[in-house]
């Protein structure tokens, strides 16, 4: 997240929370569990952190997913959402992108991952640079 000036502590906390949701989703997929299980656990954490009404949109117009596979098309199956009762296959790639949306703005994380025999591996930056860079 690049910020001109400074980011309020409220927005920094929201970003930290979405990074935690991302880590929860990655952990579930890393274990080879179903994408629907990753959705349920990510959603539960977001709700526990107080973001249930703003996760992936503002209620009632929220998207009901936390990530999607990437391939020949940008959005492919499986999706981190209810009803995708299968794991991300070995060799599969997935963009994991939890966000919170408020009338005053939105913030979240997005990185792309591949699942190999050892689990989930980032193929984009995933924290290799600071989550917030101010200038």
Feature locations, PLM:
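Active-site neighborhoods and metal-handling regions in enzymes and metal-associated proteins
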Residues: 1-135
